[in-house]
Amino acid sequence: MKQFISEAEPDRNGTLTLTGKAFTYLRKVRRMREGDSLPVLLPGGRSVMMGADRIDDGKREIRLRLQTVPQQDENIAATATVESPAAAQTEIILLQWILKGAKTDTIVRQAAEAGVHIIVPVIGEFSVARKQNPAQQERFRRIIKEARQQSGSPIDTRITEPAPLSAVMQHTVPPLLGSGTVCGMCSEAAGTALSVHTFLAAKPARIMLAIGAEGGISPAETTMLAAAGFKTIHFNTNVLRAETAALYAVAAMQTIRNEADQWQLPASIS
């Protein structure tokens, strides 16, 4: 279900007064009218229903008010909350090599829609776009917010500053490792790579996934990842473009992990 992500909590009267980009989104994109309601995700992570009780197009201002539901005691009303989607069985951290043009923007949007927890942009040896625009990070955050509003994702997807793999492995990755974490790097070559089911056989609580750029992951980067415990994963399908591989991999990991209780590897493999 689509949602609006609020940067502020309602006031003591249960209202939010919105202007600027928030007004534009609700009025022009969502086409809200007085009396309409929608789910609002608050800063603390709670999702509530709010209705538009006043719209001033002249001032470009819209006021939302918490909706209530009657309780058994007619003198008491409770805030109408929104049931969140079923929680994912695992967290996904995506180490995504920077791609050329707007392809990285596409991956960021799709990852946020799919509920990836953390996106780590990597400036790889084969990355064509090595110089980063200072405004890029703010654009990424805006893309993530728009994607979460469109998809209704309750996951507060975060994105780190783009950095070379050496810096990522030194500063970003270590705090995210721990028991219940599995790390994999995707490869178009089968070789001795693991199947996805084998990779996820232990039902990990966290998956760290590395996806290369247009030219893949360099030999030096592969060695660095392998030394950190990353296993090579291969999808038994066609050769995928880098921007396709990211969504394909995330979807495969989520589906297999979320449905882990419905399949089982032979004991000799697991």
Language-model segments: residues:
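Fold-independent oxyanion-binding glycine-rich loops
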Residues: 7-8, 20-21, 43, 97-98, ...
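RNA substrate-binding interface of SAM-dependent RNA methyltransferases
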Residues: 74-184
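Active-site/ligand-binding-proximal alpha/beta "capping" segment
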Residues: 175-224, 230-234
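Structured adenosyl-cofactor binding patch, chiefly the S-adenosyl-L-methionine
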Residues: 219-270
